[in-house]
Amino acid sequence: MHTLTGFSLVSLLSFGYLSWDWAKPSFVADGPGEAGEQPSAAPPQPPHIIFILTDDQGYHDVGYHGSDIETPTLDRLAAKGVKLENYYIQPICTPSRSQLLTGRYQIHTGLQHSIIRPQQPNCLPLDQVTLPQKLQEAGYSTHMVGKWHLGFYRKECLPTRRGFDTFLGSLTGNVDYYTYDNCDGPGVCGFDLHEGENVAWGLSGQYSTMLYAQRASHILASHSPQRPLFLYVAFQAVHTPLQSPREYLYRYRTMGNVARRKYAAMVTCMDEAVRNITWALKRYGFYNNSVIIFSSDNGGQTFSGGSNWPLRGRKGTYWEGGVRGLGFVHSPLLKRKQRTSRALMHITDWYPTLVGLAGGTTSAADGLDGYDVWPAISEGRASPRTEILHNIDPLYNHAQHGSLEGGFGIWNTAVQAAIRVGEWKLLTGDPGYGDWIPPQTLATFPGSWWNLERMASVRQAVWLFNISADPYEREDLAGQRPDVVRTLLARLAEYNRTAIPVRYPAENPRAHPDFNGGAWGPWASDEEEEEEEGRARSFSRGRRKKKCKICKLRSFFRKLNTRLMSQRI
């Protein structure tokens, strides 16, 4: 029997990842698609859909992109499936998740600016039908495990009210991997692990990556393969704080940079969690009729161990390092496997693609910005997508050298925006930190980093690149091709005319966890008017006793440091 790297068989059994009969050679495979794979058969329809989303995993942080981080499961799944090498996501958490579940650009959900913060009376628009709701209509059982980060101020915003039959995970964007505490400012700390619509106090102490993989396996064990399943696993990994079980840290003990060492350990732990989920798919009879999709949610945070090398930029930016995603599809149902696809794709495309796979339908009335790209993925056909609106953020419009005049009277180039049309990519305003940063493998002083190349400060607000010829964004062609600049600025203006107002309300003190028994959760009543959202009101509800003041203080400064490094995120 093969050795299980990082997990002993006993630990896997104790955590519930394996049952004893999994230890038999007939069920333990070297990896997905290898020994132990079930024989091919005509699959029933519709397929089971397993969507795995990772958090802050950089473009370079997977083995098949030449990383120094071990990801054998992801490498094997991708090698036997279809690698998506022209696939785009959003630069930060909430926007990617909202576009995945609605199939709409940020300008069409009102979530153009930043993320949904824990104390904001904001959530995924309640009038929009989500992907899991469409799949429920098609007869699917829908389950979510992991990070939500799409708002929770009202109960109607919760995952179980937005299309998921079950939910286990966190509602906010950043929690401790063991205690599930999250601080959103000095003294504004609370517990954030929920099962359904209840606080899951009893699960505290379990490392989230292992807990979420265990729950995903349990869902598979208790579900009939005869009923179509949608399983959305949104790992917290590898977002900060950088925490990992000790056994994973040990294998990277020679890595000089402490942040990179911890980050690498977290990635490898997540890789093995994916392996356990894949085993469960085979063990319980789902695999032959399953489509497994793997995607990152945004670029890696280079100041916290991540790497997007050789792409330019990082998380929170509109350079390629912030928006080009890690992605692949693995499935016995693919007609052309073991290949790389360079068809243009975007995270909004999963909505119509998966609804189509499920036997459902979409129409122009749905207002989708995504396309059905299954023929491009499965058969290698051309993508129906020819352009991507990365975003228009009208609230971030203070680029010093931008102006309407600088945009030929077509577009105010002080506004942060980015668009891809064909092979051309245009950025305006302030795209964010734009250096090329190699993996941080060398030892550094705390809070510092090193660059192979550093861009000098430039006085401009418009950039143009031929991404097909220059994927690393080294040669700005804005001065040489004003005709293309004009065309793309006009396209931005066209998109902007369809945008709805930005929804970014002020934080509400009523959201404080102390008014909710010590946990983050819904605080607004269903009947409240929007103008009341943001008013400060005092509550007299009982407070949860603070168990560890120094822990909360450390958590706050850890989050504060991350925010400072992330610039606006």
Swiss-Prot record:
It is an enzyme of class 3 (hydrolase). Its EC number is 3.1.6.-. The keyword Nucleotidyltransferase does not apply. Ca(2+) binds at residues 55-56, 93, 297-298. One of its GO terms (molecular function) is metal ion binding. Residues 1-23 form the signal peptide. It comes from the Eukaryota. Expressed in placenta, in embryonic stem cells, fetal eyes and lens. Binds 1 Ca(2+) ion per subunit. The active site is at 93 (nucleophile), 149. The oxidation of Cys-93 residue to 3-oxoalanine (also known as C(alpha)-formylglycine) by SUMF1/Sulfatase-modifying factor 1, seems critical for catalytic activity. Residues 510-539 are annotated as: Disordered. Substrate binds at residues 147, 239, 315. Keywords: Calcium, Endoplasmic reticulum, Glycoprotein, Hydrolase, Metal-binding, Oxidation, Secreted, Signal. The modification 3-oxoalanine (Cys) is found at residue 93. It is found in: Secreted; Endoplasmic reticulum. Its cofactor is Ca(2+). Belongs to the sulfatase family. Displays arylsulfatase activity at neutral pH, when co-expressed with SUMF1; arylsulfatase activity is measured in the secretion medium of retinal cell line, but no activity is recorded when measured in cell extracts. Lacks arylsulfatase activity. This is Arylsulfatase I. It comes from Homo sapiens. The lineage of its organism: Eukaryota, Metazoa, Chordata, Craniata, Vertebrata.
